[in-house]
């Protein structure tokens, strides 16, 4: 099933004031996904090869993507189950003909959405054009939707404990920050390894309509991690993350805080409530 909908540019990670202007919908929204395979439902718990191209208004496949250091390159493939219970985040290679291919294992059955976060190279500037394209998928098996759950300031996943210190009152279009400490199973500060050009990723989806934005947590030695973005996250010592965020809509949101600790990708889900 296809849902070829382009959304506005993501907020990325960069500097911001107490109130920011949200980015407009990108003109690149006329680009669309083509040739998505497989065309039908996919299995849960087994690797499946997905492939597609992004086609431009003139019918040619997009082949010019931003490259280099930092997270604002190529495409991010973010698969999210529609009840916001699970997420898979990948950064696949792109073939010279524009084909995007990746092997994905879906952890659970049900309705999923692929959000392709695109960083397209623009001529005459180093700033990529950023926009998103959506694709619906069905994963075979019995679907039992899970509630989003209450707001909690501490989550333990894979033995690592993520704790938010002083939850702010979140409001639409206000730049704000979450200060999060992360400890390993022994209670010591966790050490993150750069992953997809950032020290950690904060992926946000709104419950219901799946509105999206994505920011990055950057350490001082990560070149271009915070480039050309609306609000920055940062980390200056092990186990301490400062997450930048600005919400485009009120409602209930899920934050998937992701990072590489050792050789493992760890994802901590938090429920958040945003006021208008």
For each of these PLM feature ranges, what is it?
Residues 13-276:
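N-terminal soluble domains immediately following signal/targeting peptides that reside
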Residues 8-12:
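C-terminal motif of bacterial Sec signal peptides marking the signal peptidase cleavage site
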Residues 1-5:
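Sec-dependent N-terminal signal peptides
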């Amino acid at each position: 099933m296809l849902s070829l909908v382009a959304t506005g540019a993501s907020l990325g990670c960069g500097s911001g004031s107490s109130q920011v202007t949200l980015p407009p919908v990108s003109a690149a929204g006329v680009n669309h996904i083509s040739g998505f395979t497989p065309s039908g439902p996919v299995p849960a718990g087994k690797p499946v090869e997905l492939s597609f191209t992004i086609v431009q208004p003139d019918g040619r496949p997009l082949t010019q993507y931003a490259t280099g250091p930092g997270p604002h390159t190529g495409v991010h493939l973010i698969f999210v189950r529609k009840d916001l219970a699970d997420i898979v985040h990948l950064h696949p290679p792109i073939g010279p003909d524009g084909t995007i291919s990746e092997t994905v294992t879906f952890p659970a059955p049900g309705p999923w959405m692929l959000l392709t976060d695109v960083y397209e190279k623009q001529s005459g500037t180093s700033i990529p054009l950023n926009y998103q394209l959506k694709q619906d998928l069905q994963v075979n098996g019995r679907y039992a939707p899970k509630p989003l759950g209450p707001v909690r300031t501490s989550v333990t996943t894979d033995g690592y404990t993520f704790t938010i210190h002083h939850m702010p009152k979140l409001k639409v279009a206000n730049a704000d920050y979450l200060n999060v400490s992360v400890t390993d199973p022994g209670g010591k500060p966790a050490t993150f390894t750069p992953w997809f050009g950032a020290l950690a990723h904060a992926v946000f989806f709104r419950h219901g309509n799946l509105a999206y934005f994505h920011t990055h947590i950057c350490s001082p030695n990560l070149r271009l991690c915070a480039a050309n973005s609306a609000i920055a996250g940062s980390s200056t010592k092990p186990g301490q993350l400062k997450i930048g965020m600005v919400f485009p809509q009120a409602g209930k949101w899920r934050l998937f805080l992701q990072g590489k600790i050792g050789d493992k990708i760890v994802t901590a889900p938090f429920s958040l409530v945003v006021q208008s």
